C-alpha cells in the first residue's frame, strides 16, 4: 500500500477513532456477523451490511441488501450497486451511530 491509498476513518460507533487502509482487490465487508472484516455492534446494522472495495477506477461501496441501508453524504444508496466514494465522503451504516469518513 502507498500513502495515497484511501483510508476509512471511524467517526462514530464500533470503529470510532480507528483508521483502516483499503487494500487493492480485497473488499472490506462490514456487518454484525463475525465473518465480516469490520464487525459493527449496532442493531441497526445487518449481518452482512455493505462492502468497500478499491478498484482500478477508485474506491466504491456496495450495500448488500441491508435492512436499514447505507448512506453516503446523507443520501441512501441503492442496494447491490457500486457507488463511487471520494475523500471527504461520510458513510453511515444502518444509522448515524455507525459512520466513517474517507481520507
Residue ranges and their predicted role:
Residues 1-43, 53, 87-90:
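Intrinsically disordered, low-complexity acidic Ser/Thr-rich regulatory segments
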Residues 5-10, 58-64:
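Short, well-ordered strand-loop elements centered on a beta-strand within folded domains, enriched
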Residues 15-16, 36-37, 46, 60, ...:
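Short, surface-exposed beta-strand-loop junctions and turns on beta-sheet-rich folds
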Residues 30, 65, 71-103:
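C-terminal boundary/linker segments immediately following FHA domains
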Residues 41, 53, 62, 101-103:
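Solvent-exposed beta-strand sheet faces enriched in polar/charged residues
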Residues 44-45, 58, 82:
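Residue at a beta-strand N-cap/secondary-structure junction
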Amino acid at each position: 500500500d502507498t500513502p495515497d491509498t484511501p483510508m476509512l476513518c471511524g467517526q462514530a460507533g464500533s470503529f470510532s477513532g480507528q483508521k483502516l487502509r483499503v487494500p487493492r482487490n480485497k473488499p472490506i465487508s462490514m456487518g454484525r456477523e463475525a465473518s465480516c472484516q469490520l464487525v459493527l455492534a449496532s442493531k441497526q446494522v445487518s449481518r452482512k451490511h455493505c462492502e468497500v472495495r478499491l478498484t482500478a477506477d477508485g474506491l466504491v461501496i456496495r450495500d448488500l441488501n441491508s435492512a436499514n441501508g447505507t448512506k453516503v453524504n446523507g443520501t441512501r444508496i441503492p442496494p447491490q450497486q457500486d457507488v463511487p466514494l471520494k475523500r471527504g465522503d461520510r458513510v453511515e451504516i444502518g444509522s448515524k451511530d455507525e459512520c466513517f469518513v474517507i481520507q
